Amino acid sequence: DAGEGRHWENGILIQQVSIPYSTMMLGGKVKVNLPSGKSGFLSVAGNSQPGDRRRMSKAGYLQGDLDLEFILDEQEELTSEQIEVLERLRDVGL
């Protein structure tokens, strides 16, 4: 069993990492919980896309590699401030 949010693909452990839209577009760091129970921070390059991957050597099971696959952090509800900001982004063509 690969664990929650993880699956095996061609012998490599893949873990999905939920990343906020603003971090995908602008870059930044996100906290990642590793299979070992430890956590670390992943640097996300600006203009990243859902489905992009980063490999962490020796971070998987039995010191194997771990691929971190970016997924978009989907909000269940937006605040009025978030809606306002998104509307402004739409108005400038983003």
Question: Could you describe each region identified by the protein language model?
Answer:
Residues 1-94:
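Intrinsically disordered, low-complexity linker/assembly segments
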